[in-house]
A protein has these predicted regions:
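Positively charged, Gly/Ser-enriched RNA/tRNA-binding surfaces
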Residues: 19-37, 48-51, 72, 82-94, ...
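Polyanion/phosphate-binding surface patch
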Residues: 42, 46-75
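Acidic, His- and aromatic-enriched active-site or binding-groove loops in soluble protein domains
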Residues: 61-72, 177-205, 291-293
Length: 382
């Protein structure tokens, strides 16, 4: 019989015992940190009905998910942990206490091209806060402040949480008369770090059909940089021209104020107008976290505010805010930096306990010495 050559599919992770223990220890740090802030663990199915996952994912999501038929059922593997959470809260909302704070660490699946830092199967570690009817903006600052504490406990120092607000972007695009194209523009701008401004300009004028003037206005706007206060001051120059923009700017100023109050150093967070997030369900504050020594890896932690994600499953208003660590990507980066303990044993136990039968004792006596002989006292039942 011909033998099948064993192999691991591209983009899927399979670890030896020692690195698997390192990954488990990272997860333990995350669990303890999340629990410290009052988040409860949750698990949701890996497989969902396709209509659940695609309710508000946008065209990019449909291209990436693993989708299949089983009998008459149209099914898919989850591509993140946020959409299943929205379904869960809509389904079980009558049995939950709000605001509902949950964390989840689990595998997700995306059919993208496997490359360094990008996987088809990978762990995400999420925290989310869901409100009933309303959710105070202070939560939008608490979430990234917890990520600051989490990364610090993992031994990371040179990282930056970049913050923006999608209302600012939507309001600015409305000023340009581009309201109907705002979603497509944000998904295009979200590619800036990967493809650069020239290619983004080409997509804006080519695929989206924007004028050179409009594309230039967008690129100049998102290029506003400086200290957090300098960026906010520059944005104040646009206040009064669009209500959505004004609301987003007020929210962003509040989040920045709370982040400082929560003890997050300014070198670890920055207002960045290029941050848009590609998923359609974000409505307010958005985040991306990068490792300053590894910008080529991209974001290792991202998320934001979503007001309407549960509307496809219930009429109840369930606004939320959350953030997700790309744990698999972060694990490999820490390994490359030598920040994972290479001396971990390949077995979890320090001591092996064997049954001391008459047949076994002569075999192990030469290795263990006289002290290994069981005493009559220790063998008595108690």
């Amino acid at each position: 019989m011909a033998k099948i050559t064993p192999r691991t599919l591209s983009g899927f992770m399979e670890l030896l015992p020692a690195p698997q223990q390192q990954l488990e220890r990272m997860m333990d740090i995350l669990r303890k940190t999340y629990a410290l802030y009052g988040f409860t663990p949750l698990d949701t199915p890996v497989i969902e009905a396709s209509e659940v996952l695609l309710a508000k994912g946008g065209g990019e999501t449909e291209k990436q998910i693993y989708r299949f038929q089983k009998g008459d059922a149209d099914l898919a593997l989850r591509f993140d942990l946020t959409v299943p959470l929205a379904k869960y809260v809509a389904l079980h909302g009558g049995e939950l206490s709000f605001p509902f704070r949950r964390y989840q660490i689990g595998k997700v699946y995306r059919g993208e091209r496997a490359q360094r830092g990008r996987f088809r199967e990978f762990y995400q570690a999420d925290i989310d806060i869901i409100g009933d009817g309303k959710l105070d903006i202070a939560n939008e600052a608490e979430i990234p402040s917890i990520i600051y504490q989490t990364f610090t406990r993992l031994g990371l120092k040179r990282f930056q949480i970049r913050v923006n607000n999608r209302k600012i972007l939507n309001g600015f695009y409305a000023m340009l008369g581009l309201t109907e194209q705002s979603g497509d523009i944000m998904r295009t701008v979200d590619k800036l770090d990967k493809i650069g401004p020239d290619k983004v300009r080409g997509l804006l004028t080519g695929e989206l059909g924007l004028t050179e003037e409009a594309a230039g206005d967008i690129l100049r706007f998102i290029a506003i940089t400086g200290s957090n206060q300098e960026v906010l001051t520059a944005l104040e120059g646009y206040r009064g021209r669009n209500e959505v923009f004004d609301a987003g700017l007020t929210e962003l100023e509040t989040v920045v104020k709370y982040l400082a109050a929560f003890g997050v150093p300014e070198e670890n967070f920055a207002v960045d107008l290029t941050i848009a997030r590609g998923l359609d369900y974000y409505t307010g504050t958005v985040y991306e976290t990068t490792l300053l020594d590894h910008p080529e890896i991209g974001s290792v932690c991202s998320g934001g505010r979503y007001d309407n994600l549960a509307e496809y499953y219930t009429d109840r208003q369930l606004p939320g805010v959350g953030i997700s660590i790309g744990l698999t990507r972060l694990f490999y980066v820490l390994g490359e930096q030598g920040m994972l303990n290479p001396q971990l044993p390949t077995a979890p136990a320090d001591v092996l306990i064997l049954p001391m039968t008459a047949e076994l004792t002569p075999a192990i006596q030469p290795e263990c010495g006289p002290s290994s002989t069981p005493s009559r006292r220790s063998s008595r039942p108690r």
